[in-house]
Amino acid sequence: MRFTQQLFALAATATLATANSITFVNQDATQRTVYFTPSAGLQQIDSVVIAGNDQAKVDIPESWIGNAYSVSDGAANVPGMLAEFTFNGWGGLTYFDVSAIVNPNDLDGVKELYPASELTTQVKTLISGCTVFPCSTAYYHPDDVQTVTTLETDFICTLGNPTTEVAREVKTELVPRKFVLGKF
């Protein structure tokens, strides 16, 4: 009986250690809905409504590949800036970027994407996107070398326009798009 309990506890701990999440932080008073688009054949994630100046944490399935975008309350559901992810990809890495390819004119949606461990750091080294677009840390063209990698699996995604603007132009470690797609 005791062995079974220990085995169950170990399995639960392993599950927690490999959990993926994105915390969406709404930086202004506008309510937003975040929509998820999985790659073909992967699990759909329900959309989430985030009140103005609030946040919501969303659990992401193991090895999930896809994107998320936000739509401001009252606006048409049109994809804008995309938060793109490959969780637990090649080499156990999570690949991520903010993509302006679909709609570079979206100034109110996804802004920045970075590991949760960098939330309190002044200068973020693993970041994609920016507070004011255009910037050099967003993905603008197919095969752009703007994808960032990390072993971390918990992320922060900022939405909307912060009340204080801080420009972050930090050199980040980038990898070619083929690794994100698993095409070596």
Predicted regions and their residues:
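Fungal secretory targeting signals
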Residues: 1-21, 180-184
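Extracellular low-complexity, O-glycosylation-prone Ser/Thr/Pro/Gly-rich "stalks"
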Residues: 22-48, 56-65, 70-184
